[in-house]
Amino acid sequence: MKKRFLAVLLLAALLTLPGCGGEKQTAFQVGDKVETYWFQFTVDQVKTTDRWMDYQPQEGDRLAVCYLTLESTFSEAVPMNWADFVLVWGGGEADGSYPIEYQGQEQLPDEYDLVKGEERTGCLVFEVPQGVTQAKLVFQELFNEGDSDSVYTEGDTYTVDVDLPA
């Protein structure tokens, strides 16, 4: 529930605030290479399932598994974590979710560094309502203000349209 609430806040921010790079918001499809400030990523494939290892979704939900390839293009290691990507659907206040916690297998860790020149593949697993058939995987650039860990400037927002098979 906490992750879903945070996703709602991110969704509200994404829908109301323009990025610092102008009004640019770039939309992509599964298989397209998305180039951000720090790295490139591709959503290679999306599947749905009723269970991921030992994790079962709430009643009425299922899991969307987004397989990604990330490639660092930045001159330094880029810290990554579970909150970097969010899956959003519909237009309501509760229509979004952060990935579930790391369960193992090919899932991307909750925290890791994307080292200069590194290519990493893995998946993010999201809990979504059963009836959702289309969504967007969202990444938004956030730049630290000086030494602050809590003050950010928003950069560009990237969305990848995904179909969630029944």
Region roles according to the model:
Residues 1-7:
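Bacterial N-terminal signal peptides that target proteins for export
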Residues 15-19:
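C-terminal motif of bacterial Sec signal peptides marking the signal peptidase cleavage site
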Residues 21-23:
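Bacterial signal peptide processing site
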Residues 28-60:
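Low-complexity, acidic Ser/Thr/Pro/Gly-rich terminal tails and inter-domain linkers that flank the onset
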Residues 39, 64-66, 120:
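Hydrophobic core residues within well-ordered beta-strands of beta-rich domains
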Residues 47-65, 76-77, 112-115:
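Short, solvent-exposed beta-strand/turn "edge" segments of beta-rich domains on protein surfaces
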Residues 123-150:
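Short, surface-exposed ligand- or partner-binding patches at beta-edge/loop junctions that are enriched
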